Regions:
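Alpha-helical recognition segments enriched in aromatics with Gly/Pro capping
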Residues: 1-2, 107-109, 166-329
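Residue patterns forming the tRNA-binding/recognition surfaces of aminoacyl-tRNA synthetases
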Residues: 1-176, 187-191, 259-260, 291, ...
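A glycine-rich phosphate-binding loop feature that marks nucleotide/adenosyl-phosphate handling sites
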Residues: 2, 39-49, 113-121, 282-285, ...
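Acidic/polar loop patches that form or flank catalytic/metal-binding clefts of enzymes
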Residues: 33-36, 211-212, 272-279, 315, ...
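Conserved phosphate/anionic-ligand binding catalytic regions in large, soluble enzymes, centered on
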Residues: 46-48, 53-54, 101, 107-108, ...
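Short alpha-helical scaffolding segments that buttress acidic/His motifs in well-ordered protein cores
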Residues: 98, 219, 223, 263-264, ...
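A short secondary-structure junction motif
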Residues: 222, 226-230, 288, 321-325, ...
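Acidic, turn-prone loop/beta-hairpin segments
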Residues: 362-391, 422-509
């Protein structure tokens, strides 16, 4: 409760902060007060109620980091960071100055630290259930199973009583409910309330060993994710070894001292290698006024309202094009999402709508997905520009540079709508269905179909609609979804840099 105990009798029962003046006077009377004054500094407060926290010195378990640092730095040097300055900057410097890691917590819920201690000074770190059973007496094993059975029965009764009342309310399928009812939990329950009652036999003196009361820091568990998800090394060793290190992870800038760090510590300690090969680090999203987002203050737009009002695609593209993907803070604004919709989504949809409108009027159907061998310079130019765009986007995506992709896409949409379609409109409008008109349709069809695949990772919903409609007339060669297609490969033979330069000069003139 934040009150002094009998260890300091003069202030027993007083709130820690209320005794400051009395403590100061006691030190002064003893002639040991060197200086008294006030300093301004940051002080930790409870993130829920803003109450000042109290520092308390306690004994804890630490993981020694110093012997691992050199290997951690070498492993970090092999990781591709986006943005790259984090590797040797914030993350690398963090490793260099990292203290020993306090891996224990004094709370009830959590993974029990599997260390048993004996009064003779001997300690055992238990590495598996099998080892735990070996060190336990038979009575303790049976006691654990009995406690587990009682717990499961109690939980099962509560779940059935409460869930039964609400199945209808949430329209939960009865078959699913029966399936859950039949599911049981392994009898080897090692939650704290059970494992704390498991005393081991000391192999040194034969006396009783008791588990240390602390639980693991949850960040230790986060760093264990690659191994825990496969129950490695006890199961699925081949699956783990095939997928470790991970090819790619992504998280916020704060994780340079969190998940990225704990993954690196444990991978270096266990295997002497990096835990991941590529990492994209995003910045922190702030309120429009630059303040931290707060549920209590409600200083942000409801995400559901943003999705319903502006769409998931617009929000997704806005975030991909924001400073957030460069590990910089983003002041979120609905205006920014709206502007992205006007700059990209609407022009792209209008280009698709233009094609569909006139293709339906002329009953035009595609012979296939490929671009025609048109001699028209506009057709050759837009196909060249498309392949150049595919090449540039693919190159940046290969290097995880998401923030460099959207400007390329915006530029292509601008060229497609404000130059190609605008300068080709009369080819679609004319009444006769000659070769030039057919080439215009086939070219625009190919461009829209290919570009929908390029845009699919960025506008997943809009591109799915466009792709499915455009391929509905194709008898063969199309996927059921744009997201099942391979990313387009640039056709270098269709890229004409000289023609692109001439067209750019024409536009500027």
């Amino acid at each position: 409760e934040g009150r002094f105990t009998g260890a300091v009798a003069p202030w027993q029962g007083k709130l820690v902060f209320d005794a400051d003046e009395e403590i100061t006077q006691t030190i002064k009377k003893a002639g040991r007060l060197v200086h008294r004054g006030k300093i301004e500094h940051r002080y930790p407060h409870c993130y829920r109620c803003d109450t000042p926290l109290i520092y308390k010195t306690i004994e804890t378990w630490f993981m020694k980091i110093e012997p691992l640092k050199q290997n951690m730095l070498e492993n970090n040097g092999r990781i591709h960071w986006v943005p790259d300055h984090l590797r040797d900057g914030r993350f690398g410097k963090g490793i260099e100055s990292a203290p020993d890691w306090n891996v224990s917590r004094n709370r009830y819920w959590g993974t029990p630290i599997p260390i048993w201690q004996c009064e003779c000074g001997h300690s055992e770190c238990v590495g598996s259930l099998k080892q735990l059973h070996t060190l336990m007496g038979a009575g303790d094993r049976e006691k654990g199973k009995q406690r587990h059975a009682e717990t499961v029965a109690k939980v099962s009764r509560s779940v059935k009583e409460e869930a039964g009342k609400r199945l209808g309310e949430f329209k939960v399928d009865a078959a699913w409910a029966r399936k859950i009812e039949a599911t049981d939990i392994d009898e080897n329950d090692i939650h704290r309330h059970i494992v704390d009652e498991c005393d081991l036999i000391c192999p040194v003196c034969g006396q009783t060993m008791v588990r240390t009361p602390e639980v693991l820091d949850c960040w230790f568990e986060s760093g264990s994710m690659p191994y825990a998800q496969n129950h490695y090394p006890f199961e699925r060793a081949e699956a783990f070894e095939r997928n470790f290190p991970a090819d790619f992870i992504a998280e916020g800038l704060d994780q340079t001292r969190g998940w990225f760090y704990t993954l690196t510590v444990l991978a270096s300690a266990l295997f002497g290698k990096e835990a991941f090969r590529n990492v994209v680090v995003n910045g922190i999203i702030l309120a429009e006024d630059g303040k931290k987002l707060s549920k209590r203050l409600r200083n942000y737009a409801d995400p559901v309202d943003v999705l319903n009002g502006l769409g998931a695609d617009a929000l997704r593209l806005f975030l991909i094009n924001s400073p957030a993907v460069k590990a910089e803070d983003l002041r979120f604004s609905e205006r920014g999402v709206s502007e992205m919709s006007r700059a990209v989504l609407l022009p792209f949809w209008n280009a698709y709508s233009f094609f569909v409108t006139y293709a339906n009027v002329d009953n035009w159907t595609p012979a296939g997905p490929h671009a025609p061998a048109s001699e028209n310079e506009l057709d050759r130019w837009v196909v060249s520009l498309l392949n150049d765009t595919i090449r540039r986007v693919n190159d940046q995506m290969e290097h995880y540079n998401l923030y460099r992709v959207v400007p390329v896409l915006v530029s292509f949409i601008d060229n497609l709508t404000n130059w190609y379609i605008r300068r080709s409109r009369r080819r679609f409008w004319k009444s006769e269905n000659d070769a030039d008109k057919t080439n215009a349709y086939a070219t625009l069809y190919h461009v829209l179909l290919s570009f929908s695949k390029v845009m699919a990772p960025f506008l997943p919903f809009m591109t799915e609609t466009i792709y499915r409609n455009l391929t509905s007339a194709l008898k063969t060669g199309s996927c059921t979804s744009v997201h099942l297609c391979s990313f387009p490969a640039a056709d270098g033979g269709r890229i004409d840099e000289e023609l692109e330069e001439k067209m750019d000069l024409t536009r500027r003139a």
